Amino acid sequence: MHHGIKGMRWGVKRMLQKMGKRYDSDVKWHASTGDKKYDKAMSKSIAKDKAQLMGMTNKYEIKAKRSFDSSKYDRLRYGWDNNKVNAKRASKISDKMNKAFEENKGTLTKLAANKSRAYSVGGKAFLAGAGAIAAGMAIAKFGNPKNQRLMNVGKNLVLSGFTAASLSGIGLLAGMHYGDKQFETEGNIYARVKKSTRV
């Protein structure tokens, strides 16, 4: 049951505010291609997604939804850049992705929870290698999973940021593992939806 933001746990409320802002910046980036129809379609989709997120009360579900949407926008944008996705198709894919999120919510939420927990173990134990880790994570996230070498470069950069044997290393590796799985799961769902969405 959702009793509005007021009766919510403070942590969840704060998270919703933070995540809500990210959707606002998504509009700036993903709905400003200059293609009026596509931008309008994306603005609508992003507003819909944000409204959906604002109705959630479980923090891991919120994280899962945010990660899912963020990855959806990136993939749609990539499709648009490569002339594979137009406004109409983007709207359809976005709507179908929301259905797919509901259907796969259990798995996606579990992955988000595991990732968060693993990172908090890792995060408490280290701060020193943060720069290398940030660079490594960026590469690991956007290195195409097909491009294993780039993924490995990302992971090695991350590893060089701390001693792998330490608690933080194990936590972060686990976090990256779940992060990879999350990214992969989102990608598989997107690929499936895109395939079944003809305009």
Specify the residue positions occupied by each region the protein language model found.
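Charged, amphipathic alpha-helical linkers/stalks
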Residues: 12-34, 42, 51
